[in-house]
Amino acid sequence: VVSVNLSRRTIYDPGLIKFFAETIQKYDVDPKSIEIELTESLAAQDTSFISFVIRKIKSLGFSTSIDDFGIGYSSLSAIKNIDFDVLKLDKSFIDDVEVDKTSESLVSSIISLVHGLKMFVIAEGVENPSQVSILKKHDLDAIQGYYFAKPLEVSEFEALLDHNKFEEAKTKETKKANRRTKKGGDEK
């Protein structure tokens, strides 16, 4: 799935839905392979209009997500009234989840709440195996972040697509992190 983040200007463009419909037809793109993202701040504004646009986007077959959830514009009303498929939990909740029980409790509660709304939950900004372990414990659906890779050049990304190399690299990284945890220090 490729995510496309819509700007404020784009979401209010009266030709947006027609553009999406024509583009998927012209290039024979499966809309199920594309997720349309709106930031939380945008979704929390004109919820009735945003809800209308999201319904139109979904009617074309796209999935939709609310991005950066929890960074100051949190609106339970927005996730209640707008039919998003995915909620992306902001990195600020993940940064200290392994050392702060309050953060862990909050993340657990948000995951439970969002699952109750039949939405898929992704944690953004996951950087290490310890965070992954804690998030798995709370039934998180998926992660994104430096845990997998830092931003890459095209050639590096293409090399990552070789599944075996990717899995080998993650297994090696996880084993190193586990040894550090057991020893209580850093290992290079």
Briefly describe each language-model feature range:
Residues 7-8:
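Conserved protein-kinase N-lobe ATP-binding Lys motif
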Residues 15:
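A conserved beta-strand->loop->alpha-helix hinge within the catalytic CA
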Residues 12, 21-97, 111-113, 117-151:
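The catalytic core of metal-dependent phosphodiesterases that act on cyclic dinucleotides
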Residues 50, 102-107:
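Short, conserved glycine- and acidic-residue-centered signature motifs
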Residues 175-188:
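Long, low-complexity, intrinsically disordered segments
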Residues 136, 152-175:
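C-terminal helical cap(s) of enzyme catalytic domains, especially alpha/beta-barrels
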